[in-house]
Amino acid sequence: MNRALRKVLLQAGGVARFGPGAVPWRTLGTVSEGNNKGAQQHYDIIIVGGGMVGTALACSLGKNSRLQDKRVLLLEAASGFKQPSIEQYSNRVSAINKNAHRLMKRIGAWEEIERTRIKPVLKMQVWDACSDALITFNYDDFSDNISWIVENDVLLASVYRQLETVPNVEIRYSAKLADCTLVRDGAERSTVQLTNGELLTCELLCVQSL
C-alpha cells in the first residue's frame, strides 16, 4: 500500500496527455477561481480515485500540519460510500504490513479497524516453486505480529470516517474522469476534465487505481 502511495504522486510540466512518470516537485500555492461549473476550479492537490490508496493519501495529506492551508480534492466515481455490514464478512481482504500499519495509526484509523474486525498473521511460510527449499516466519521470532489481515471495506470505512474530520479535504462523489493533462517544462497547472463538463486545475495530480 505504501509503495503504491509513493508511485502515484504526479506533478505537472508542457501539456502532455496523462501517462506514467514523475516530474519534479515544486511549491504548492492556493488560488481561488470560483465554484461555478463554467469556471475553472483550482485546488492545490487533486486525487482521482477514492479507494483504499486514494482515501489514505487524502487523509494523510489533510492531517499533515505543513499542508493544512492547502486545498485537497478527492474525486470518486461511485455515487456515495456505503458503510460495510458488521454482521456480514467480506472475502476481499488485504495484508497490512508494518509500514501500512504505521500509516493507519498516524491518520487515526487503526483503533477503529481493531475494534471492528482484524486478524493478525502469526506464521508465514514461503517456498520455492522449483525446489523443496522453504523458509518459515513465526510470531515467536519477532516482537510483533508479522502482518494483519483486514477486510478492504472495514479499512476504507475507518479511513473515510477520519476524512470527515479533515476540513481542508473535499470529497466529490459521482465524479468521473473524462480527460486530464499534465504540465511540463514550466507550464502552470495540470487540468482535470470531468464527464459533466467541469474543468478543474491543480498543482499536484495523483491518480489511484486501488
Model-predicted regions and their roles:
Residues T116-L210:
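Conserved N-terminal helical subregion
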Residues N35-V53, L73:
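Beta1/beta-strand and adjacent pyrophosphate-binding region of the FAD-binding site
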Residues S32-K37, G62-D69, V166-P167, R184-G186:
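Alpha-helix termini
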Residues I86-A129:
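N-terminal FAD cofactor-binding segment of flavoenzymes
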Residues M1-Q41:
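N-terminal mitochondrial targeting presequence
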Residues V48, G62-N91:
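Glycine-rich FAD pyrophosphate-binding loop
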Residues L57-K70, L103, L204:
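A short, Lys/Arg-enriched amphipathic alpha-helix followed by its capping loop at the start of a domain
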